[in-house]
Amino acid sequence: MSSDNQSKTLIGQVVSDKRDKTVTVRIDRKVKHPLYGKIVTRSSKYHAHDELNQYKLGDIVAISETRPKSKTKAWQVVRVIKVN
């Protein structure tokens, strides 16, 4: 029996805090190019729920997968790792 109730957790940087109760978090990952072998950086942006509007631009935060809060929000900020 595996524990499937573990939610995904990602670490990224807040790149936008303009929306109410929402921050945009950029997740960077390194991948090897399939043909040339060079290590390149790929990034994805996720909208995450921030109930108290406490996370600011540039903060490094951990986000966790949750039930959908809106059309584009299915992640929630868990904690701050580094304050800008």
UniProtKB/Swiss-Prot annotation:
Pfam families for the chain: Ribosomal_S17
Alphabetic keyword roster: Ribonucleoprotein, Ribosomal protein, RNA-binding, rRNA-binding
GO molecular function: rRNA binding; structural constituent of ribosome
Record GO biological process: translation
Keyword rRNA-binding on entry: yes
GO cellular component: cytosolic small ribosomal subunit
Family annotation (CDD domains): Ribosomal_uS17
Superkingdom per UniProt: Bacteria
Gene3D superfamilies linked to this entry: Nucleic acid-binding proteins
Record note on quaternary structure: Part of the 30S ribosomal subunit.
Protein role: One of the primary rRNA binding proteins, it binds specifically to the 5'-end of 16S ribosomal RNA.
Cross-referenced HAMAP family: Ribosomal_uS17_B
NCBIfam families per record: PRK05610.1 (NF004123), uS17_bact (TIGR03635)
Family: Belongs to the universal ribosomal protein uS17 family.
Protein's UniProt name: Small ribosomal subunit protein uS17
